[in-house]
UniProtKB/Swiss-Prot annotation:
Coiled coil: none
Function statement: Catalyzes the isomerization of sedoheptulose 7-phosphate in D-glycero-D-manno-heptose 7-phosphate.
Protein name, as recorded: Phosphoheptose isomerase
Comment field (misc): The reaction produces a racemic mixture of D-glycero-alpha-D-manno-heptose 7-phosphate and D-glycero-beta-D-manno-heptose 7-phosphate.
Source lineage: Bacteria, Pseudomonadati, Pseudomonadota, Gammaproteobacteria, Methylococcales
Main location class: cytoplasm
One BP term from GO: carbohydrate metabolic process
Keyword set, alphabetical order: Carbohydrate metabolism, Cytoplasm, Isomerase, Metal-binding, Zinc
Species whose genome carries this gene: Methylococcus capsulatus (strain ATCC 33009 / NCIMB 11132 / Bath)
One of the record's GO cellular component terms: cytoplasm
Oligomeric form and interacting partners: Homotetramer.
Family: Belongs to the SIS family. GmhA subfamily.
Swiss-Prot/TrEMBL cofactor(s): Zn(2+)
Length: 195
């Protein structure tokens, strides 16, 4: 396969994954956006976490909320739990890496807040621990998950929202998670600030 054919294959796989996500996940995205807007209107905040590329996506979502998406508006309270290297490394060193997000959720999260989890597999112990900590704090969870949902999917309650991209490729899951993130940002802005 030559380079151009490889490029075409990536674009085709992306388009196919996006179309499947639109068909399968539109309702869940809409529900998640409504929950985020309700949380913010109720003076709650959003905490975000993930590992690796999913950490970058958590930071991206948080920055779009805190700063702006595609229009001028006041900043919205969102915190990426992935950014403070002193906190992350002290928790990992003093306790265990599994606790890097959970300890922050227990310290910062309150009833009515939302934890947004990004995971391509649903099996990372650190996000699983964060989910349990959020539930203990009576927080809702929005999980941008992947593949078969892993161990995360069965942890979720009826009040939580799972947006699961079932693509077999980590790259495709991350691409669709980014598209979903932008949909959530747009819908939250629309619900809070109108057209």
């Amino acid at each position: 396969m030559n380079p151009h054919e490889r490029i075409e294959r990536h674009f085709s796989a992306h388009i196919e994954a996006a179309q499947e996500a639109l068909t399968m996940l539109g309702d869940a995205i809409e529900i998640a956006a409504a929950k985020l807007a309700h949380c913010l209107l109720s003076d709650g905040k959003i905490l975000c976490c993930g590992n690796g590329g999913s950490a970058a996506q958590a930071q991206h979502f948080s920055s779009e909320m805190l700063n702006r998406f595609e229009r001028e508006r006041p900043g919205l309270p969102a915190v990426a739990l992935t950014t403070d290297t002193s906190t992350l490394t002290s928790i990992a060193n003093d306790y265990h890496f599994d606790e890097v997000f959970a300890k922050q959720v227990r310290a910062l999260g309150h009833a009515g807040d939302i934890l947004v989890i990004y995971s391509t597999s649903g099996i990372s112990p650190s996000v699983l621990s964060a989910a349990v900590a959020a539930q203990d704090r009576d927080m809702s969870i929005i999980a941008l998950n992947g593949r078969d949902g892993g161990t995360l999917a069965p942890l979720l309650r009826d009040t939580d929202v799972e947006i699961r991209v079932t693509a077999p490729s980590t790259a495709r899951i991350q691409e669709i998670h980014l598209l979903i993130t932008h949909c959530l940002c747009d819908l939250v802005d629309h619900q809070l600030f109108g057209e």
